[in-house]
């Protein structure tokens, strides 16, 4: 629950390395933090629900770190039990999987320009109640989903297309 900043005076060696506390933010135990661009997203349980926070370096001050609560406006949206956070900078999103809603994939879409967030939204994809999303991950513009359903387990993929028009 403590984030460290590693520094060194001169060449990095075992004698010159220094670790200083950079910040302190509570985080969940089950989902590994996930980096997209200059941000790292992580989960933090809050009551019966989970916050997803974005850890970042404050503009032009690389030693100062902070975290935004991306779910601050939807406090009761993602149930506890987050076990996976994945995403891609190609399409600017993260996906979150939770044991509290195995049949859903929560999606956080965002757009930054010149270090300023222009847009952000939370949504979810809901699969049949009996289904379980076991994993989801992205490579470029394609999301891969491992979904367990009554007929077995499938590896599925969805393509996101940047600059698509309706």
Name each model feature, range by range.
Residues 2-166:
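Beta-sheet-dominated scaffold domains
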């Amino acid at each position: 629950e403590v984030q460290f900043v590693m520094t060194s005076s001169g060449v990095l060696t075992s004698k010159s390395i220094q670790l200083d506390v950079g910040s302190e933010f509570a985080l969940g135990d089950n989902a590994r933090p996930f980096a997209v661009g200059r941000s790292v997203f992580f989960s933090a349980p809050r009551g019966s629900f989970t916050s997803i926070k974005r850890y970042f370096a404050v503009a032009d001050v690389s030693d100062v770190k902070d975290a935004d609560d991306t779910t601050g406006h939807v406090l009761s949206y993602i149930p506890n039990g987050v076990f996976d956070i994945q995403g891609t900078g190609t399409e600017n999103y993260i996906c979150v999987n939770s044991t509290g809603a195995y049949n859903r994939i929560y999606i956080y879409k965002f757009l930054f320009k010149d270090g300023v967030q222009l847009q952000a939204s939370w949504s979810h994809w809901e699969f049949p109640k009996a289904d379980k999303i076991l994993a989801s991950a992205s490579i470029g513009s394609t999301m891969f989903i491992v979904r367990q359903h009554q007929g077995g387990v499938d590896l599925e993929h969805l393509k996101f297309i940047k600059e698509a028009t309706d």
